[in-house]
Amino acid sequence: MSSYQQKQTFTPPPQLQQQQVKQPSQPPPQEIFVPTTKEPCHSKVPQPGNTKIPEPGCTKVPEPGCTKVPEPGCTKVPEPGCTKVPEPGCTKVPEPGCTKVPEPGYTKVPEPGSIKVPDQGFIKFPEPGAIKVPEQGYTKVPVPGYTKLPEPCPSTVTPGPAQQKTKQK
């Protein structure tokens, strides 16, 4: 019986050594672990006690067309402070008829001399003081659960003589 135990304890070490020898060639599939692959073989990771090495056909590495990675220009990330997501119940939406839209004479368009267009192609927007925004007292907080947004009024700024002067220089 003791000779049988010796054979049993003597046999596993060579198998473990084989596994250790083959492991350096195995890490690339293990490092590229893509959870989107739904193959049952992929989830089987060899355990320390398990000396069975998965077959080459069992471990599936996703092909270039399988995993979709958005292209650099495809994904749009909003600039900090640009997108504001309101918390539920905290959204302030004015009721229809309560929002005072500035009249044509009320909106202050920057003077022709206040807009500078640099030669590099960058557009300098008017400073906060140049455009007059209606104060907070004009809008009312709606009844909770009522979410109708007023239609935005596009403001058009036409380039004045300042741009023509810049082009002439």
Swiss-Prot record:
GO biological process: epidermis development; keratinization; keratinocyte differentiation; wound healing
Induction field: During squamous differentiation of epidermal keratinocytes.
Biased composition, class Polar residues, residue ranges: 155-169
GO cellular component: cornified envelope; cytosol; extracellular exosome; Golgi apparatus; perinuclear region of cytoplasm
Principal cellular location given in the protein's record: cytoplasm
A Pfam short name: Cornifin
Keywords: Acetylation, Cytoplasm, Keratinization, Repeat
Region of interest (Disordered), ranges: 1-57, 150-169
Region (14 X 8 AA approximate tandem repeats): 43-154
N-acetylserine, modified sites: S2
Family: Belongs to the cornifin (SPRR) family.
Protein name as annotated: Small proline-rich protein 3
